[in-house]
From Swiss-Prot:
InterPro entries: L-PG_synthase/AglD (IPR022791). Keywords: Cell membrane, Membrane, Transmembrane, Transmembrane helix. This is UPF0104 membrane protein MJ1078. The keyword Membrane applies. Coiled coil: none annotated. It is found in: Cell membrane. GO terms for cellular component: plasma membrane. NCBIfam families: flippase-like domain. Belongs to the UPF0104 family. Its main location: membrane. It comes from the Archaea.
């Protein structure tokens, strides 16, 4: 999370693969494959919970922009699923002469298959629970500012703004998330002073705290990694 808060394009996910290699002696490509499939499940949980919270918050008056975002979220999920199955089919049929590239692709496939069918219910439950708990952050901010908004709207606000971080344009969605959160709060007729107060507290919790404590942990982790022997698995 710390790396993703500093660099665009979700490059922090590659760093997670690097850490997996250092800690377990597994390849980076296997770690990236595991992170990729994790992101797909996260996106499924996010879009599903976003639709539920939007419907319960707005009933039949869900803003068309929100419906548009949900529609594109579903399209992205379907595209990723097709991409995964396409990769698995193609990778099982090709025979590469480059052994290093072949090892990278095989380990990536191994990472994609790390999720077993019998673990799916638990994984989906944890994803839903995780996103719901994260959504409570905004609701508690509402309470601290004496804003009379329901808990599901807090969850919806967090999910709708977090969805933009899945589009790796800026580090942690800087700029686009702020705009989205202000826009969402205006849907409930929150004035700009209240909306900006929510935004400042939200970013202090969801961004600057990660940068601060993440920097400390990054220093500790990297210092330990430098002491470990190198290996050459890809």
């Amino acid at each position: 999370m710390f790396i993703n808060s500093l660099v665009p394009a979700k490059l922090g996910d590659v760093y997670r693969g690097y850490l997996l290699k250092k800690k377990t002696n597994e390849s980076i490509s296997l770690g990236v494959g595991t992170v990729f499939i994790e992101r797909v499940f996260d996106l499924v949980a996010m879009i599903s919970l976003l639709f539920i919270s939007a419907y319960l918050s707005f009933k039949s008056d869900i803003p068309k922009e929100i419906l548009y975002s949900i529609k594109w979220g579903v399209i992205i999920i379907l595209f990723l699923i097709i991409l995964i199955f396409g990769f698995l089919i193609v990778n099982s049929k090709i025979n590469l002469k480059n052994k290093k590239l072949e090892a990278i692709l095989m380990n990536f496939e191994k990472g994609l298959k790390a999720v077993k069918l019998n673990t799916l219910p638990l994984l989906i439950t944890l994803s839903f629970t995780g996103w719901f708990i994260e959504g409570l952050t905004v609701y508690f901010i509402f309470l601290s500012l004496n804003l009379n908004l329901e808990i599901l709207f807090g969850v919806f606000s967090d999910l709708a703004s977090s969805l933009l971080t899945a589009i790796p344009l800026t580090p942690s969605g800087l700029g686009v998330v702020e705009y989205a959160l202000i826009y969402i709060l205006k849907l409930k007729n929150i004035d700009y002073s209240g909306a900006f107060a929510v935004l400042i507290l939200y970013r202090l919790i969801s961004y600057f705290s990660i940068v601060l404590f993440g920097a400390i942990m990054f220093y500790i982790v990297e210092r330990n990694i430098l002491k470990e022997p190198k290996n050459e698995k890809y």
